[in-house]
C-alpha cells in the first residue's frame, strides 16, 4: 500500500504546479479512488458516470469549476436504500493499493426526492487521507435514458495509480439532461451549475447537431417535458438581481478560475441550443455542426 504522507506531498505539489487549491485536489483524488473501487467491483456494469465529475475528466484543465461529488445513473440494481447500502459496504471494503481509508461507520444512504418518476439515492461516507478528513457524496439517479449509448472510458489519475474503467454518459445526453433541468425547473431554478456546464461545453466541444437534437428529444420525452416555454430565455430571467447574486455565489463557491457574467452565459446557451429547439418545435431535422472555437453553428 502507498504511503499516505508521500501521496499527500505529491498531491500538494500537483496543486501548487497547477495553481489549484490543495483541499480541492485532495477531494478529486479521493473521488478518483472511489470510482476505482466501483470499477473493480461486481457492480461496475450497474453504474454510469455523469455530471460535473465526468466533465472534469472530459475537459481536464479546461473545466474550471471544482467538483465535490459523484453523479451516477443506476440501472438493473435496486433503488432501495438498505440494498444500496449493502452494495457500497462491499465496494468501500475492497482492499486497494492507495492509502485512502473509508470509515464504514459513517456510511449513510438516503432518498433524494428531486427525481421525478423514480426516487434517487445519496450515498455518503467519510474518507481519510492520513489525518485529513474528506467527505464523499454520491448521487444516484434511476430510470433515465442515455442517447447515444453510454461509452466506456478510462478515468485519468492525478498520480500513477491504476485508473478506473467505467461507463459514462455521452456528451449529448449530458447536455440534454442539464437543459431539461433548466427548462423543467423554470422560474424556481437555483441550479447554477447547469447553466455553467452547458456554457462551458459549448466552448470546448464540437457537436453533431443531429445527435444533439435526438438526445434532447429523447430526454425531454422520457421526462415528459415540453419545448413550448423556456423561462430561462426570457429577457428578465438573467436580469433578476437575486439570480445574478446566486450566480456570483456559485462561481465563488466552486472556485471558478475564469468567471463569466450570467447574462453572457445565458446568451451563449441561447446561441447554442435555440436553433436545435426551434427545429424540434417545427418538427424539422437539425443537421448543423457546432464549431466550439467560434461558438457558432455551421
Regions from the PLM with identified roles:
Residues 1-47, 56-66, 70, 74-298:
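Structured mid-to-C-terminal alpha-helical surface segments
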Amino acid at each position: 500500500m502507498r504511503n499516505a504522507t508521500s501521496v499527500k506531498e505529491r498531491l500538494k505539489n500537483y496543486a501548487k504546479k497547477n495553481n489549484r487549491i490543495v483541499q480541492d485536489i485532495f477531494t478529486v483524488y479521493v473521488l478518483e479512488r472511489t470510482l476505482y473501487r466501483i470499477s473493480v467491483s461486481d457492480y461496475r456494469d450497474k453504474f454510469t458516470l455523469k455530471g460535473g465529475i465526468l466533465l472534469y475528466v472530459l475537459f481536464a484543465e479546461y473545466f474550471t469549476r471544482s467538483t465535490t461529488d459523484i453523479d451516477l445513473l443506476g440501472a438493473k440494481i435496486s433503488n432501495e436504500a438498505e440494498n444500496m447500502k449493502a452494495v457500497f459496504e462491499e465496494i468501500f471494503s475492497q482492499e486497494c493499493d492507495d492509502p485512502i481509508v473509508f470509515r464504514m461507520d459513517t456510511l449513510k444512504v438516503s432518498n433524494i426526492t428531486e427525481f421525478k418518476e423514480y426516487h434517487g439515492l445519496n450515498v455518503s461516507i467519510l474518507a481519510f487521507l492520513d489525518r485529513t478528513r474528506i467527505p464523499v457524496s454520491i448521487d444516484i439517479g434511476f430510470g433515465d435514458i442515455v442517447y447515444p449509448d453510454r461509452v466506456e472510458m478510462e478515468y485519468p489519475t492525478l498520480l500513477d495509480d491504476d485508473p478506473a474503467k467505467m461507463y459514462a454518459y455521452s456528451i449529448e445526453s449530458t447536455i440534454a439532461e442539464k437543459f431539461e433541468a433548466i427548462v423543467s425547473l423554470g422560474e424556481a431554478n437555483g441550479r447554477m451549475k447547469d447553466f455553467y456546464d452547458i456554457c462551458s461545453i459549448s466552448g470546448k466541444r464540437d457537436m453533431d447537431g443531429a445527435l444533439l437534437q435526438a438526445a434532447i428529444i429523447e430526454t425531454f420525452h422520457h421526462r415528459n417535458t415540453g419545448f413550448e416555454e423556456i423561462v430561462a430565455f426570457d429577457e428578465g430571467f438573467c436580469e433578476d438581481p437575486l439570480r445574478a447574486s446566486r450566480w456570483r455565489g456559485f462561481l465563488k463557491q466552486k472556485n471558478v478560475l475564469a468567471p463569466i457574467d450570467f447574462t453572457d452565459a445565458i446568451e451563449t446557451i441561447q446561441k447554442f441550443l435555440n436553433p436545435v429547439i426551434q427545429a424540434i418545435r417545427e418538427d424539422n431535422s437539425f443537421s448543423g455542426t457546432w464549431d466550439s472555437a467560434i461558438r457558432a453553428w455551421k
